[in-house]
UniProtKB/Swiss-Prot annotation:
Main location: nucleus
UniProt keyword Cell division present: no
Modified-residue entries (N-acetylthreonine), positions: 2
UniProt-recorded name of the protein: Pirin-1
Disruption phenotype: Altered response to blue light (BL) and abscisic acid (ABA).
Function in brief: Involved in abscisic acid signal transduction. Plays a role in seed germination and early seedling development. Involved in the blue light (BL) signaling.
Keyword Nucleus found: yes
Disulfide-bonded cysteines: none
Signal sequence coordinates: none
Subcellular location: Nucleus
Pfam families named in the record: Pirin, Pirin_C
Any one of the GO CC terms: nucleus
Keywords: Abscisic acid signaling pathway, Acetylation, Nucleus
Originating species: Arabidopsis thaliana (Mouse-ear cress)
């Protein structure tokens, strides 16, 4: 991959291990982004790797004020809402959901073995009450490129001359890289954007600088300022797979409470009231 010689490399400023935790009955999660990192990682609100048994899942629940990206790594989940939208997200598929002013949906596993990731992306105040919508991409529809031992799936943004067709209300890059043993990649990222990586597989990934220590799976790696993210796979036997995620900061107050992401506590209170009274985007809560 080519890049400008005057590029400014982004170095690692923080790394966090997403520890395995139980959540409810039959679900296990790894929380990669929590409230403590929301200011540092603006516009990103939450990142969770999840797996749940056939007896588990998430019955009808509301959302408002953000977009969610669900990316299945293994198995599948069945998604539906009271308006009749229903679909199954299989391994390699993506659902990009704009909750906007209000959406109610459920998510249940299709198979006993399933594993996926969900990212929440904040919306600016001017977009928080937009109409909800879904964009679903099958694995076959996601553009990809391969070069010098590096494969990338371009879910949002662009890489290796390939551009995703997905429109994101908050400008976002979402790339799934797999580096064969001994390979490296250098990805340009807009200088003003926030950028981080989440390692899915591998134990000898070097991020930001060749002088950095190797980082293993299930870590979130946060990058500092610059316009170039460099990654090396130092393993001689194992591939390195990671998500590179970047986005334009919004720079507004963030108040998250449960399924709602707004700008103030008053707006959070209003969201709960609207849901409980089935109004202002949550009319289907009556069903």
């Amino acid at each position: 991959m080519t890049y400008e010689n005057n590029s400014v490399p982004r170095i690692v400023i923080k790394k966090v291990l997403a520890k395995l935790e139980k959540e409810g009955e039959g679900a296990v999660v790894r929380n990669g982004i929590t409230k403590i990192d929301q200011k540092l990682l603006d516009p990103f609100v939450l990142l969770v790797e999840f797996s749940f048994s056939l007896s588990a899942g998430f019955p009808d629940h509301p959302h408002r004020g953000f977009e969610s990206v669900t990316y299945m790594l293994q198995g599948g989940i069945i998604h539906k809402d009271p308006k009749g939208h229903k679909g199954t997200i299989q391994a390699g598929d993506v659902q990009w959901m704009t909750a906007g002013r209000g959406i109610i949906h459920s998510e249940f596993p299709e198979e006993e073995v399933n594993n996926g990731l969900q990212l929440w992306i904040n919306l600016p105040s001017t977009e928080k009450m937009t109409e909800p919508k879904y964009k679903e991409l099958s694995s076959l529809d996601i553009p990809r490129a391969e070069e010098n031992g590096v494969e990338v799936k371009v879910i949002a943004g662009d890489s290796m001359g390939i551009k995703s067709p997905v429109y994101t209300r908050t400008p976002t890059m979402f790339l799934d890289f797999t580096l064969k043993p001994g390979s490296q990649t250098h990805q340009t990222v807009p200088e003003s954007w926030t950028a981080f990586a989440y390692i899915i597989e591998g134990d000898e990934g070097v991020f930001g600088s060749l002088n950095s220590s190797a980082i293993s799976a299930h870590h979130v790696v946060v990058f500092g300022p610059g316009d170039l993210v460099s990654v090396w796979n130092k393993s001689t036997s194992r591939s390195l797979r990671f998500l590179l995620i970047a986005g334009e900061p919004i720079g507004e107050p963030v108040v998250q409470c449960g399924p709602f992401v707004m700008n103030s506590q008053a707006e959070i209170d209003m969201a709960f009231d609207d849901y409980q009274n089935a109004k202002n985007g949550f009319e289907m809560a009556k069903c």
